């Protein structure tokens, strides 16, 4: 038997799909040449058949003289027709073993590594098997760009395993949801309405700020951020800032926590009766105008009402006729009610009544018709000395 026949016999011993041992003969930048043990033929092991990382260094995976188990993929004929070479793969052999290990592991949580952002989701690798996480299963919120997960290792839940169709689907969202639920239950177990706790500002919206309480986000509504009115949330807090907040309400079923920042600091109405009293005359700024009056800020955070009837001695239909927002005015305090957080004010109490108006009132009083004075009924006798006549003189000529 000649050398060529020996070569053919050795080739016949190698079949596509076989798992064989191979010794590394040489290594260059992109591939390694191996000798398939017991056959007398060689194989080619490319970087692509070693790892999914296209930027990897092949020397990190194989060394000359090292013996590896590889999977025979197909026969490759070289330029010399007498030379037969096989393309082999270490990566696919490991993947086959990994697929076998995946059978029956649906719903199990495993750690994967993100390899590439693709259309519709993220490619990941787990023990040599390439898997896929749809974008809708990456997070609790839809992820439009999966690039941030590339190169990251994270826990996922196995949802589908089908080796024949090379289908390996996982979900990161379910793991995140489970972790969030566990953290939420733990946090809710420690919280109570009325507690003052420390949290970190997670995000700011037009209607308030969300505070991270260590697993649960609570909302400080715009109205609970400050004692001042019409403030912008961004002017009160900043993202990342740690603040103390008071718990107003808890709803574990809905995962909702209502918080207040202003309840943790003294309010403008605290001790207001020592700062403001009935009869005081103070300067203020018109803050708001309504149909029934004007609200004037007399102390920081304290607006008093000047009723429309207290704006001027003249009759006005609308406060806008006499005042405008931002105007500085002098007012007299008519009443202070700290419990009701109400202050009544007057502008006209500091103004003299117009002389013309006083004259008109006097004229009205003078022109008013006087009612006749009632005469008292009296029983009396007319003495003769007063009339000069006696009763006989008055009725003497009357014939009966």
UniProtKB/Swiss-Prot annotation:
One GO biological process term = translation
User: Where is the segment annotated Disordered?
Assistant: 351-400
Report what the Swiss-Prot or TrEMBL entry states about this protein's PTMs.
Phosphorylated.
Task: Output the lineage of the source organism.
Answer: Bacteria, Bacillati, Bacillota, Bacilli, Lactobacillales
A family per Pfam: S1
Ranges of Basic and acidic residues composition bias in the record: 351-366
Q: Which UniProt keywords apply?
A: Phosphoprotein, Repeat, Ribonucleoprotein, Ribosomal protein, RNA-binding
Question: What's this protein's name?
Answer: Small ribosomal subunit protein bS1
The family line of this record is: Belongs to the bacterial ribosomal protein bS1 family.
Q: Which residues form the S1 motif domain?
A: 17-87, 107-173, 194-262, 279-348
**Which species expresses this protein natively?**
Streptococcus pneumoniae (strain ATCC BAA-255 / R6)
Q: What does this protein do?
A: Binds mRNA; thus facilitating recognition of the initiation point. It is needed to translate mRNA with a short Shine-Dalgarno (SD) purine-rich sequence.
Q: Cross-referenced InterPro entries, in alphabetical order?
A: NA-bd_OB-fold, Ribos_protein_bS1-like, Ribosomal_protein_S1-like, S1_domain
Q: One GO term of the cellular component aspect?
A: cytosolic small ribosomal subunit
| CDD domains noted in UniProt | S1_RPS1_repeat_ec2_hs2 (cd04465), S1_RPS1_repeat_ec3 (cd05688)
The lineage's top-level taxon is Bacteria
Q: Which GO terms describe its molecular function?
A: mRNA binding; structural constituent of ribosome
Is this entry keyworded Ribosomal protein?
Answer: yes
């Amino acid at each position: 038997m000649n050398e060529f026949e020996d070569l053919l016999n050795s080739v016949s011993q190698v079949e596509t799909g076989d798992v064989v041992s191979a010794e590394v003969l040489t290594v260059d930048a992109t591939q390694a040449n191996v000798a398939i043990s017991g056959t007398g033929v060689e194989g080619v092991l490319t970087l692509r058949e070693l790892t999914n990382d296209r930027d990897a260094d092949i020397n990190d995976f194989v060394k000359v003289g090292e013996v590896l188990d590889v999977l025979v993929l197909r026969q490759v004929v070289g330029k010399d027709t007498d030379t037969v070479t096989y393309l082999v793969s270490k990566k696919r052999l490991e993947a086959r073993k990994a697929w076998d290990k995946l059978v029956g592991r649906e719903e199990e949580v495993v750690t994967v590594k993100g390899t590439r952002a693709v259309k519709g989701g993220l490619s990941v690798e787990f023990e040599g098997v390439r898997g896929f996480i749809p974008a809708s299963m990456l997070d609790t919120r839809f992820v439009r760009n999966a690039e941030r997960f590339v190169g990251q290792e994270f826990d996922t839940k196995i949802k589908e395993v089908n080796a024949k169709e090379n289908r390996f689907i996982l979900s990161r969202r379910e793991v995140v949801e489970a972790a969030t639920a566990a953290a939420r239950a733990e946090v809710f177990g420690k919280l109570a309405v009325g507690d003052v706790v420390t949290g970190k500002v997670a995000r700011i919206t037009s209607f308030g700020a969300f505070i991270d309480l260590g697993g649960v986000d609570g909302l400080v509504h715009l109205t609970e951020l400050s004692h001042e009115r019409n403030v912008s949330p961004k002017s009160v807090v900043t993202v990342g800032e740690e603040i103390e907040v008071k718990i107003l309400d808890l709803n574990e079923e809905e995962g909702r926590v209502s918080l207040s920042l202003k309840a943790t600091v003294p309010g403008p109405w605290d001790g207001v009766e020592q700062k403001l009293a009935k009869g005081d005359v103070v300067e203020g700024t018109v803050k708001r105008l309504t149909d029934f009056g004007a609200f004037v800020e007399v102390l920081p955070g304290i607006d008093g009402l000047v009723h429309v009837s207290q704006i001027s001695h003249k009759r006005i239909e609308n406060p806008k006729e006499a005042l405008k927002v931002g105007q500085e005015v002098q007012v007299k305090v008519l009443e202070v009610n700290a419990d009701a957080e109400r202050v009544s004010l007057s502008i006209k109490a500091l103004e003299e009544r117009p002389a013309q108006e006083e004259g008109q009132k006097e004229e009205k009083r003078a022109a008013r018709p006087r009612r006749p004075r009632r005469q008292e009924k009296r029983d009396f006798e007319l003495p003769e000395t007063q009339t000069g006549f006696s009763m006989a003189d008055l009725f003497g000529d009357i014939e009966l």
